[in-house]
Amino acid sequence: MARAVSLRPVGELELLPVAVDAMGGDHAPSAIVAGARAAADAGIAVVLVGPPELVGDTLGLPLVPCTEVISMDDDPAQSVRTKKDSSLVRAAELVRDGQACAMVSAGNTGATMGSALLRMGRLPSVLRPCIGAPIPRPGGTPVVLADAGANAECTPQMLVQFARMAAAYCTARYGVEQPKIGLLSIGEEATKGTPLVKETHELLLETGLNFFGNVEGRDLLNSPVDVIVTDGFTGNVALKTMEGALKFVMGVLGDVIGTDDETKAAGMTLLPHLLPFVGDLDPDAIGGAMLLGLGGVCIISHGSSSAKAITNAISVGRELAIGGSTSRIAASIL
Amino acid sequence: MARAVSLRPVGELELLPVAVDAMGGDHAPSAIVAGARAAADAGIAVVLVGPPELVGDTLGLPLVPCTEVISMDDDPAQSVRTKKDSSLVRAAELVRDGQACAMVSAGNTGATMGSALLRMGRLPSVLRPCIGAPIPRPGGTPVVLADAGANAECTPQMLVQFARMAAAYCTARYGVEQPKIGLLSIGEEATKGTPLVKETHELLLETGLNFFGNVEGRDLLNSPVDVIVTDGFTGNVALKTMEGALKFVMGVLGDVIGTDDETKAAGMTLLPHLLPFVGDLDPDAIGGAMLLGLGGVCIISHGSSSAKAITNAISVGRELAIGGSTSRIAASIL
């Protein structure tokens, strides 16, 4: 399935726009186009991809036309094969064909992965690409959680590759040298967890990576490590649990502050002090997750992405492309 | 390993005290003894278990003396076999021997499970006991998460039993008839997840249980179901992730409110409105998790349990014992 990839020189990528799936996400196309416009205004070249009649006003941005759209409900594996002229598949082709330096989509995650994998190909020796999702760490660089949901079933060898790729990504994106790696388990002891975790623990000790040891669910938001490695099932459950808990508390706080004039005034007093934390925890400010292990840069943004989230994702996509993240990731597993 | 169990008549249990491991937990023995004293003051018979010289002042409560203590760091499997005169093992024996209606410990979770399993035995047909942990649901009954950490590796047949036992427990503890069952996965579709999840999904459809379908991590605190079924690895990661996220936000809020006099005043204004939520989310108010599938009632309290948490755990233990929860759970899997 994976084709041989030859990486483009970074200097060549610098001249290319970021391809943006105009039809992906709950607020597409309006929020996507607005976010792309803001990125363009900040000096980043972008090109939209989508059916002209559905995208509507492009706000002056270039549009690569196509005829199909993969919806959130479409079966990922099937849709990327049958909808070959969809905005997702065409965006991935622009990266493959050297017409874009990176792609960004807030659409169907499985189909985004499938399009990127089929069109950009897998890096040599990569068993499976994974999702590296940034988890905010107030006052520090985000923690990279990998795999955040691409592979429900994993082998120890896959998890070791996730660790290598996520470490390279952490260095490329956040400048962290020798990132500390944690393995998600249900206790700090090497003897705790599933056979998958125990075997991966042993293998990680031999990699030469900066392996910290096991970490637990409670460490996600207060992490002693820079990278958390896990299978895509556990990673996805943990990430959504964390997001759900944060959203829940924010909702409670919003309700309480909105109770009456007195509580509103109290909320206004606290707001300037809370804002730095809210900003740090805001998924829209984080810039999306990256697919690790492909022959090009693909950024997956939240389905609920706002224009701001898309602008950030575009910016991150370009930085990773011209920063040579793909070469770094390729080198990490050779 | 499991012995045949014969359940005691509920009327007999009503006359028995709750056995409390005086040496279990980060704040043992002082918080444990104080919590037991408060339960006794509320009219619940309790008996402490522990080495007299370590327990110290029992505040007038009866003490079953023993000579050993299993620490948090002790290997669970080994310690329950070698430390036969430990407070944990002796507490489980009191239940087995009809001298206590239930046991409560905030100590080493693995050793608590081991002691209870070895001494009380497994209910007939139970493949594996599991931990049923209550997750607070503000404004409603708590959601029972099973397995919250007893079995890192599970089969579909085990998960189906967890669903049955947790449903019986949910009815016994919270009075919910025909509890709605959710299966923790990474998407609502039956086709999402690991082979374990997919096969369990199929089996749950045939059980006659009130099976809702798959739920996701984000549903833990905002749940459409009364019971969430998962393997003990995923359940433990999800529970700790949720607790970590809540603790993190509470910490941020506390810091912000403590900034200066103005923010303290604002905090005082919001406090009465926040308290109901904080109370609902307070693990100390929840009363601990129950081991499901044993021949007696064993309540596992948080390692960080306060006196209040222990009082609640004792109260829950007694209620479950005299409410016939063990018979209900036994009946659920026959």
Identify the residue ranges that each predicted region occupies.
Chain A
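N-terminal phosphate-binding or glycine-rich loops at protein starts, especially the Walker A/P-loop
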Residues: A2-L54
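Short, glycine-rich nucleotide/cofactor-binding loops
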Residues: P17-P29, V80, A150-V160, I300-A307
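Short glycine-rich anion-binding loops that position phosphate/pyrophosphate groups of nucleotides
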Residues: M23-G24, E68-V69, N108-A111, L118, ...
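Short glycine/serine/threonine-rich phosphate/pyrophosphate-binding segments
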Residues: H27-I32, D85-G98, A102-A116, L127-I131, ...
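A glycine-rich phosphate/pyrophosphate-binding beta-strand-loop-alpha-helix module
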Residues: P29-S30, A36, A42, L48-V49, ...
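Glycine-rich phosphate/diphosphate-binding loop of Rossmann-like nucleotide-binding domains
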Residues: S30, V47-E53, G60, A152-G217, ...
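Phosphate/nucleotide-donor binding subsite
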Residues: G60-A100
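Glycine-rich phosphate/nucleotide-binding loop
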Residues: L117-T141, L145, P224-I228, G232-L334
